[in-house]
Amino acid sequence: MSEIKLGIIGGGQLGSMLSEAARKLNIKTIIYCDDPNAPAKNFCDDFIYAEYNNKEKIYEFAKKVDVITYEFENIPFDTLSELNKLKPVSPKPSVNRLIQHRLAEKDFINKLNIRTTRYVLIKSKEELLPLEDFLPGILK
């Protein structure tokens, strides 16, 4: 059986932990990150530093891996979609698009009958004032 190469987009703490866990399973990891000093650089087998919209580097990354995942939600949707044409990306880019928008994410979860905290969309300061019953609360 040939060695598995896992591509991880993002090089933070989760990328570091994923690389460490993969190593225990004899899975090679290649990190793609826009931070040249990312913590995961110290734990992976290969590291590609580039902006997330650098098509040349994205293709270089895809050639080196068998499957791709990402460690945080702020990867551009277009980048993940392009990668998904080249190699399997998990979670799918459509999931990434959903989790980038907190209101859409909450609405989706509630449609699955999974309870979340109460929430409301506020578009202006005037809409905030009558919402005293939501306090204390978090404004995002």
Describe each PLM feature range.
Residues M1-Q100, A104:
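ATP-binding N-terminal substructure of ATP-dependent carboxylate-amine bond-forming enzymes
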Residues L98-K140:
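Active-site nucleotide/adenylate-binding loops and adjacent lid/helix of ATP-dependent enzymes
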